[in-house]
């Protein structure tokens, strides 16, 4: 169990190193207003913290830096919530204030804004479309031969595609089809739509649509949509601006992993509910052993729909990042309920 004095010194070392990226020595600590101990006492306490594994010496300096154990203790026991600036809160809330909530568009913009606000790499795993339920479908004619099919799900996903309208299918047929589809399919999971259409809906359509065969072929193409999650990145190259990653050999494997977007699917897909912080070698990939990954899930009720994560150095602004993720996931969850 650390003493109050050791807790204060450890917290000050971590806070200072996060801000400066420079090893922290006893002289630096002695100049801090909150540190009222003598330099000799500070050195003794730092020696004890080093022996306990919370801080470590670097090769190039007499100062100390937090170890992974030190960061973990800091995150678990010493972290204080950080109030975000009003202009950032307004910027984030404005993103989610759109009357029509398009989850994929918001996910993409969220990744970009988070990367700009943190100067780290932001990753957003969008909702898995197969678990979405159909809210409504629209078919909007552009001319006699083409139309735009718009599929909207309960999570705000909007999928649109241009389809060819067979000559034998007239506008009244289109209108009847849309009415039947919305009446019979609203609330059905996207993964079940194709099967339901061709086992049940076709029978209903046969009684209302004149050119039944042509209409069914058009429907088949309309509902062929990708069902897996989409992943969005913001600030892929931001890690290069961090002092600890100026060594290209050190950062190469990390950048390769970031470029291989599929690698993050497994990392983010099965995250536990709430805020999760993985520090250094707690991460499953060796390419991330000098990084911290903070992730948060967003959901509707008890149904977890996606994940928002920030990848940065272990010398990360943990409190600020957690506050940002809490605000984003809260806004995302509220938006999905619209």
UniProtKB/Swiss-Prot annotation:
Q: Which InterPro entries match?
A: GAF-like_dom_sf, HrcA, HrcA_C, WH-like_DNA-bd_sf, WH_DNA-bd_sf, WHTH_transcript_rep_HrcA_IDD
Give the record's family classification.
Belongs to the HrcA family.
Quick one: which gene encodes this?
hrcA
**One annotated GO molecular function:** DNA binding
The cross-references to Pfam families, in alphabetical order and at most eight, read: HrcA (PF01628)
A Gene Ontology biological process in which this protein takes part is: negative regulation of DNA-templated transcription
The record's NCBIfam families line, in alphabetical order, gives: hrcA (TIGR00331)
**What is the species of this protein?**
Bacillus mycoides (strain KBAB4)
Superkingdom of origin: Bacteria
What does this gene product do?
Negative regulator of class I heat shock genes (grpE-dnaK-dnaJ and groELS operons). Prevents heat-shock induction of these operons.
Q: What is the lineage of its organism?
A: Bacteria, Bacillati, Bacillota, Bacilli, Bacillales
Q: Which SUPFAM superfamilies match?
A: GAF domain-like (SSF55781), Winged helix' DNA-binding domain (SSF46785)
**Identification of the protein by name:** Heat-inducible transcription repressor HrcA
The alphabetized UniProt keywords are:
Repressor, Stress response, Transcription, Transcription regulation
């Amino acid at each position: 169990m650390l003493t109050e004095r050791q807790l204060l010194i450890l917290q000050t070392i971590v806070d200072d190193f996060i801000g400066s990226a420079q090893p922290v020595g006893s002289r630096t600590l002695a100049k801090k207003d909150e540190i009222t101990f003598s330099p000799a006492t500070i050195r003794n306490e730092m020696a004890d913290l080093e022996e306990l594994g919370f801080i470590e010496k670097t090769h190039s300096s007499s100062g100390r830096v937090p170890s992974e154990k030190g960061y973990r203790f800091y995150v678990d026991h010493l972290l204080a919530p950080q109030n975000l600036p009003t202009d950032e809160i307004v910027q984030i809330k404005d993103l989610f204030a759109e009357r029509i909530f398009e989850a994929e568009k918001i996910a993409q913009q969220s990744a970009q804004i988070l990367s700009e606000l943190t100067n780290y790499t932001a990753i957003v795993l969008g909702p898995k479309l197969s678990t979405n339920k159909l809210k409504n479908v629209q078919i909007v004619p552009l001319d006699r031969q083409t139309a735009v099919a718009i599929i909207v799900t309960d999570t705000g996903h909007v999928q649109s595609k241009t389809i060819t309208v067979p000559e034998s299918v007239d506008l009244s047929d289109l209108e009847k089809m849309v009415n039947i589809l919305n009446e019979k399919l609203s609330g059905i999971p996207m993964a079940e739509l194709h099967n339901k259409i061709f086992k049940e809906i076709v029978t209903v359509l046969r009684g209302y649509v004149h050119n039944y065969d042509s209409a069914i072929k058009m429907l088949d193409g309309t509902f062929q949509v990708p069902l897996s999650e989409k992943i969005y990145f913001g600030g892929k190259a931001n890690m290069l601006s961090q002092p600890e990653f100026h060594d290209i050999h050190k950062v190469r494997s990390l950048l390769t992993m970031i470029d291989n977007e599929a690698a993050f699917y497994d990392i983010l897909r099965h995250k536990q509910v709430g805020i999760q912080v993985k520090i250094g070698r707690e991460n499953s990939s060796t390419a991330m052993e000098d990084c911290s990954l903070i992730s948060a899930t967003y959901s509707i009720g008890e149904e977890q729909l996606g994940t928002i994560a920030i990848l940065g150095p272990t010398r990360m602004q943990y409190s600020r990042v957690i506050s940002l993720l809490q605000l984003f996931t809260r806004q995302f969850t509220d938006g999905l309920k619209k």
